[in-house]
C-alpha cells in the first residue's frame, strides 16, 4: 500500500521530540509535503487517537484544535480539514508509518485473476449447510515512481507521506 511505495516521503521527528509521540509540527510538515492534499486522507493506528485528539495549533495564550470530531453518525473525524480513519495495518505509535497521509487518487489497483467462486455441500454436511468460497487476486501501487521537485522549490512532494520512527 501507501507505506511500501518507493517514493514515500518520511517526515523526521522534531529535535527533542519524545519517543512514541505525535506533535503539531509533524502534522504541519506532512501536510506541506503531500501532493494533492485536497484529495488526501489520514490513516492512523488506533493507539494514536488520544494524541491526535489533543493536538492544538498554539495562537497566543490559546490555541485551535487540529482534530475535529464528527458531528454526524457515519461521517469521518477530521484532522487538519481532511478525513481521518483508524487503520489496523498502521504500525504502533512511534514506529514509522503510524500516521499516514495519502492521496489515494494517485494509487492504481488492478486485478490479475478474475473472480473465482466455488461451493460445497460436503464441508458442513452434518449441519445441513452449503459453503461458498470466493477468490480474487489483485495488486496496487502508486502511479508515481519518485517524489516531485517543484520548479521553484527544493522541497519534494509526493502523494504519500508518513512520520519516521520516533525513538
What are the roles of these predicted feature ranges?
Residues 1-167:
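Structured, hydrophobic secondary-structure cores that serve as assembly/anchoring elements
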Amino acid at each position: 500500500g501507501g507505506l511500501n511505495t518507493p517514493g514515500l516521503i518520511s517526515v523526521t521527528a522534531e529535535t527533542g521530540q519524545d519517543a512514541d509521540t505525535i506533535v503539531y509540527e509533524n502534522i504541519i510538515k506532512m501536510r506541506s509535503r503531500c501532493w494533492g492534499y485536497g484529495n488526501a486522507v489520514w490513516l492512523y493506528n488506533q493507539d494514536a487517537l488520544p494524541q491526535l485528539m489533543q493536538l492544538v495549533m498554539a495562537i497566543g495564550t490559546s490555541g485551535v484544535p487540529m482534530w475535529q470530531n464528527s458531528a454526524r453518525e457515519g461521517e469521518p473525524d477530521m484532522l487538519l480539514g481532511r478525513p481521518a480513519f483508524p487503520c489496523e495495518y498502521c504500525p504502533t505509535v512511534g514506529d514509522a508509518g503510524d500516521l499516514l497521509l495519502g492521496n489515494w487518487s494517485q494509487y492504481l489497483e488492478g486485478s490479475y485473476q478474475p473472480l473465482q467462486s466455488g461451493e460445497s455441500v460436503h464441508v458442513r454436511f452434518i449441519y445441513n449447510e452449503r459453503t461458498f468460497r470466493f477468490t480474487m487476486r489483485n495488486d496496487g501501487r502508486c502511479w508515481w515512481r519518485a517524489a516531485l521537485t517543484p520548479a521553484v522549490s527544493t522541497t519534494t512532494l509526493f502523494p504519500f507521506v508518513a512520520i519516521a520512527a520516533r525513538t
